[in-house]
Amino acid sequence: VEETGGRVHRVAVGGGACGEYIPQAIAQGCDTFVTSDLRYNDFLDTRGLNLIDAGHFPTENIVCPTVKAYLEEHFPEVKTVISTSHRDVIQYYL
């Protein structure tokens, strides 16, 4: 939150690689954008916008239960499962 003086007022979220939508986030008045797979130059070229690269898998996988519930409600005859073998290929260390 360095770019906004420690305050966050409006956040845009893009699951997966959504760096191309940075201009739209700014146009919508967002001061923070959470997505993944950002390029080095995205951080250098974007002033006044907090960028958070939260990882590709974590930003997409989180919606799987919601999508599954939607599909089950609208297509009850179709069996839906969430993969247990699909895992994040990146290990994060803090």
Task: State what each model feature region is.
Residues 1-94:
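Active-site catalytic microenvironments in core metabolic enzymes, especially phosphate/sugar-handling
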